[in-house]
From Swiss-Prot:
It is found in: Cell inner membrane. Induction: Transcriptionally regulated by CusR in response to copper and silver ions. Part of a cation efflux system that mediates resistance to copper and silver. This is Cation efflux system protein CusA. The chain crosses the membrane at residues 14-34, 338-358, 363-383, 391-411, 446-466, 485-505, 532-552, 871-891, 898-918, 928-948, 985-1005, 1012-1032. GO terms for biological process: copper ion export; copper ion transmembrane transport; detoxification of copper ion; intracellular copper ion homeostasis; plasma membrane copper ion transport; response to copper ion; response to silver ion; response to toxic substance. The lineage of its organism: Bacteria, Pseudomonadati, Pseudomonadota, Gammaproteobacteria, Enterobacterales. NCBIfam families: 2A0601 (TIGR00914). It comes from the Bacteria. Keywords: Cell inner membrane, Cell membrane, Copper, Copper transport, Ion transport, Membrane, Transmembrane, Transmembrane helix, Transport.
Length: 1047
């Protein structure tokens, strides 16, 4: 089949070249127009349900809202995890779906089930779907600053809410623009309880009057002078004077009682659950641009910047927009870095080809397969919808060296055959027809084996395709692009390369012996191979012993899920204890931001505590997320690295009650979306009794702090909230004609504040809040004395119908699949994650006694690593079986297929030792490198075995037991190995040359790519030894055994 394709391609070379030209043009177009991003979209398919229940405590929110929602969502088809968050006034439910679920199908199914449960929610409470986005979509953040002092926080927040937000939402693929920080303006109706009692007016009557006085109505239309006039009756509250003139009732003598008679109306701040701060200089308002899932971040950010630049002239005097996070900077750095590495690889590979072949046009034949293979890969990427990012470009980068292997072997074989023809016909001139025949025969001779070897490299990545979840989405693009590049190279090797050789390998072909590099290789390899053939069993014994040496470095390298990617920015997310007030949170935020700004490498600090106004942010008030923008690396102090900056930041920011955590922004949001855990290692304690869960979590926290490598450990306190319980006495309430609902309504309105509508001021809307004065509700004793007007117009106090007690309770409730859960956040430093987790598991098993009904599970990145390892342990053996079948089909001998498969472990030895030497940990990235190495090692074995078989087949006497001799066998093996050392050395050299820029490179994405490249480069030391020495020795023993059997 392969032979037929080669011959037909050469026969129709004009059409093939036209096809290659078309591919190059099409590929160039796709390269220019392929969307770019820093990382693949790693988000799980997620639907968020947000429900506001203002003023309600977390336990009430959990019982009345979150629990009905989570238990219902467990039945949604395709849902794998349902997480619930109940906090003060808000419920968040995150429904995580199985991989491959269409996000809009998921939203429709959640909406369907939401309709079923809506009737079980409290009156007036409505659950809403969040945007079709996730926390990973936070691509651009900005702050509004007024350095002139003309505008306060309320003005800045109004500018954000009613101007900037709507302008930015018009940009395509912006799912949401979330406001954060500042102060929301609120009209506050502060009731005087004594005056209210004096006039005999209840709180409910005031609420009703406010609602009735803030409306507009239409009166249809009338016709005047042949024109139509529409009638409207204005009634919106727009000024404080409008509020003061609201009539509550009329006295017996007809004198009206106005709102101003019983209340003070003022403009003040709405209760805050989110605070923003800039550079330690004070509070600001800001916004977060959230990208719609699966869309092009770079294009959207560019559009956002253009829009903000346009809007600058419309801003009030003194107000400026300060960019506090811009993901496009990371995208540009990552793409520029990988594109530069690809160019470096192309140049180095070209130089290596020219040095070995000693013939410029022959080198060009090999080099041209690189851009053509790149075009093929990008064309398939375009149809699949893959964007260009660190991982997809990285797949092409690690394939570059192997892509030219087939071309190199074909060119070298063509050189050999042309040289032999000249030797056989010293007086003849090679005509065009004969040249094409020689080159076609040379291609056919090695083409099938080369195609199989490239197919093996392609199939070696099957285990990566089977990875699930976040790890599958991360490494899938790399596996796809490497596969496309290698498949393209395999196709080019049998279709285009033979034609290019026919056109370009012309003129005088320098003999191999004329190249000093080739002479040096033969001079070194010749005596060594003779010794190997003389002692083949000893050679195999040494190889087996060398494989055993990897046991020592394997015990030292440790393990992790992924190395931390340097995104150029940092996220400071300290864990704090619950129950902090808004004022204390703002003070703490400013202190930490000021300390962070003191580090010279920091350019800007945008601190946030609490949540932004979006369903994608469920942060409680005590949760800090500070975005740190670093200066360009060339402006750092000499010798500073990201690790050293983090260490200095950690030593600088030391405040009581804070457990520091420094993480990359994108990586952290991905982890929180996938597992819910913001730290690299997390432990989830689940159960039914909150006190038992809390006690166990605190025990685990104490145990974790004793484990080597644990930098910080903090357990969430479920019972850390402070409560004032109003325990209604039903019997006493009944004596005054009041029901439990009446008392609860009074507490909700007088203490919590009742929202009684909003003002309409152009496009702006501001809330109206009704409540008692602060002095009447600032202590338990004050609450007891709150006056109540009963339905029977009796004056009583709250203490007459309820007991007021101070207690503790949950500040926030988390559930996973409807089970209450407490999370312990653990940050590990100076030690690999796997070793830390193993010691943690051992320590918890020995020192923590599980309570009945509780369970402990490790989460975070460790959970992802365990899942990836489980999948790879299953799929790697299956892939080896597939490769074995291909080898059998190529050689038609079980022994030869087994020889190549069994020798692959020897090739991995160098990779493991290089990992240890460079201080890298085993991870999914290094595992990917080892899988790629195994494919290349199998290719080396196939090529060597092909040459050895050709050499032996050229000596017919070796197949005859009567004429067989070990000396003749050694001579044949010598010809197959030593005289073909050039192509084997070239394949090794181009792969190493292609990978070195990746290994030693810096910049965005280099952390992952260097760990993929390291095993491959280390393996390129032992894999050639496998090909050059072990396979000839083993093949000799196989032939000797075959000869004995024949005799």
């Amino acid at each position: 089949m392969i032979e037929w394709i080669i011959r037909r391609s050469v026969a129709n070379r004009f059409l093939v070249l036209m096809g290659a030209l078309f591919l190059s043009i099409w590929g160039t177009w796709t390269i220019i127009n392929t969307p770019v991003d820093a990382l693949p979209d790693l988000s799980d398919v997620q639907v968020i349900i947000k429900t506001s229940y203002p003023g309600q405590a977390p336990q009430i929110v959990e019982n009345q809202v979150t629990y009905p929602l989570t238990t219902t969502m467990l039945s949604v088809p395709g849902a794998k995890t349902v997480r619930g968050f109940s906090q003060f006034g808000d419920s968040y439910v995150y429904v995580i779906f199985e991989d491959g679920t269409d996000p809009y199908w998921a939203r429709s199914r959640v909406l369907e089930y939401l309709n079923q449960v809506q009737g079980k929610l409290p009156a007036g409470v409505s659950a809403e779907l969040g945007p079709d986005a996730t926390g990973v979509g936070w691509i651009y953040e900005y702050a509004l600053v007024d350095r002139s002092g003309k505008h306060d926080l309320a003005d800045l927040r109004s500018l954000q809410d009613w101007f900037l937000k709507y302008e930015l939402k018009t940009i395509p693929d912006v799912a949401e623009v979330a406001s954060v920080g500042g102060v929301v303006k609120e009209y506050q109706v502060v009731i005087d309880p004594q005056r209210l009692a004096q006039y005999g007016i209840s709180l409910a009557e005031v609420k009703s009057a406010l609602d009735a006085s803030n409306q507009e109505a239409g009166g249809s239309s009338i016709e005047l002078a042949e024109a139509e006039y529409m009638v409207r009756a204005s009634g919106y509250l727009q000024t404080l004077d409008d509020f003061n003139h609201i009539v509550l009732k009329a006295s017996e003598n007809g004198v009206p009682v106005y709102l101003r008679d019983v209340a003070k109306v003022q403009i003040g701040p709405e209760m805050r659950r989110g605070i923003a701060e800039l550079n330690g200089e004070g509070e600001v308002a800001g916004g977060v641009v959230i990208l719609r899932s699966g869309k092009n971040a770079r294009e959207v950010i560019a559009a956002v910047k253009d829009k903000l630049e346009t809007l600058k002239s419309s801003l009030p005097e003194g107000v400026e927009i300060v960019t506090t996070y811009d993901r496009s900077q990371l995208i540009d750095r990552a793409i520029d870095n990988l594109s530069g590495k690809l160019l470096e690889e192309f140049i180095v590979v070209a130089v290596v080809c020219a040095l070995f072949l000693w013939h410029v046009r022959s080198a060009l034949v090999a080099i041209i397969s690189l851009p053509l293979g790149l075009c093929i890969a990008f064309i398939v990427m375009h149809f699949q919808g893959l964007n260009a990012n660190i991982m997809s470009l990285g797949g092409i980068a690690i394939a570059v060296g192997a892509m030219v292997d087939a071309a190199i072997v074909m060119i070298e074989n063509a050189h050999k055959r042309l040289e032999e023809w000249q030797h056989q016909h010293p007086d003849a001139t090679l005509d065009n027809k004969t040249r094409w025949q020689v080159i076609t025969d040379a291609s056919v001779e090695v083409g099938p084996a080369l195609f199989i070897s490239l197919l093996i490299i392609t199939l070696s990545f099957i285990p990566i395709f089977t990875l699930e979840g976040q790890e599958g989405r991360l490494f899938g693009p790399l596996a796809f692009t490497k596969t496309y590049a290698m498949a393209g190279a395999a196709l080019l090797a049998i279709v285009v390369i033979p034609i290019l050789m026919g056109y370009w390998i012309r003129g005088k072909i320098p003999p191999e012996s004329s190249n000093p590099l080739n002479r040096f290789l033969i001079r070194v390899y010749h005596p060594l191979l003779l010794k190997v053939l003389h002692w083949p069993k000893t050679t195999l014994l040494v190889a087996a012993l060398s494989v055993l040496t990897v046991l020592w470095p394997l015990n030292k390298v440790g393990g992790e899920f992924l190395p931390q990617i340097n995104e150029g920015d940092l996220l400071y997310m300290p864990s704090t204890l619950p129950g902090i007030s808004a004022a204390e949170a703002a003070s703490m935020l400013q202190k930490t931001d000021k300390l962070i700004m003191s580090v010279p490498e920091v350019a800007r600090v945008f601190g946030k505590t609490g949540k932004a106004e979006t369903a994608t942010d469920s942060a409680p008030l005590e949760m800090v997320e500070t975005t740190i923008q670093l200066k360009p690396q060339e402006q750092w102090r000499p010798g500073m690295t990201m690790d050293k900056i983090i260490e200095e930041l950690d030593n600088t920011v030391r405040l009581p009650g804070l457990a520091n955590l420094w993480v990359p922004p994108i990586r952290n949001r991905i982890d929180m979306l996938s597992t819910g855990i913001k730290s690299p290692i997390g432990i989830k304690v689940s159960g039914t009794v909150l006190a038992d869960i809390d006690a166990m979590a605190e025990q685990i926290e104490e145990v974790a702090r004793t484990v080597p490598g644990v930098a910080s450990a903090l357990a969430e306190r479920l019972e850390g909230g402070r409560y004032i319980n109003v325990e209604i006495n039903r019997e006493k309430a009944a004596r005054y004609g009041m029901t439990v609902a009446d008392v609860q309504l009074f507490v909700t309105s007088a203490v919590g504040g009742a929202m009684v509508g909003e003002t309409v001021e152009g496009i702006a809307r501001y809330p109206i809040n009704l409540r008692y004065p602060q002095s009447w509700r600032d202590s338990p004793q004050a609450l007891r004395q709150l006056p109540i007007l009963t339905p029977m117009k009796q004056q009583i106090t709250l203490a007459d119908v309820a007991d007021i007690k101070v207690s503790t309770g949950p500040s926030m409730l988390k559930t996973e699949n409807a089970r209450p859960t407490s999370w312990i956040y653990i940050d590990a430093r100076d030690r690999d994650m796997v070793s830390v987790v193993h010691d943690l598991q051992k320590a918890i098993a020995e020192k923590v006694q599980l309570k009945p009904g509780t369970s402990v599970a490790f989460s975070g990145q460790f959970e992802l690593l365990e899942r990836a390892n489980h999948k790879l342990k299953l799929m790697v053996p299956m892939t080896l079986m597939i490769i074995f079948v291909l080898l059998y089909l190529a050689f038609r001998r079980v022994g030869e297929a087994l020889l190549i498969i069994s020798s692959v472990p020897f090739a991995l030895v160098g990779g493991i030792w290089l990992l240890w030497w460079m201080g890298f940990h085993l991870s999914v990235a290094t595992g990917t490198g080892f899988i790629a190495l195994a494919g290349v090692a199998a290719e080396f074995g196939v090529v060597m075995l092909m040459y050895l078989r050709h050499a032996i087949e050229a000596v017919p006497s070796l197949n005859n037991p009567q004429t067989f001799s070990e000396q003749k066998l050694d001579e044949a093996l010598y010809h197959g190995a030593v005289l073909r050392v050039r192509p084997k050395a070239m394949t090794v050299a181009v792969i190493i040359a292609g990978l070195l820029p990746i290994l030693w490179g810096t910049g965005a994405g280099s952390e992952v790519m260097s760990r993929i490249a390291a095993p491959m480069i280390g393996g390129m030391i032992t894999a050639p030894l496998l090909s050059l020495f072990i396979i000839p020795a083993a093949y000799k023993l196989m032939w000797l055994h075959r000869h004995r059997v024949r005799k």
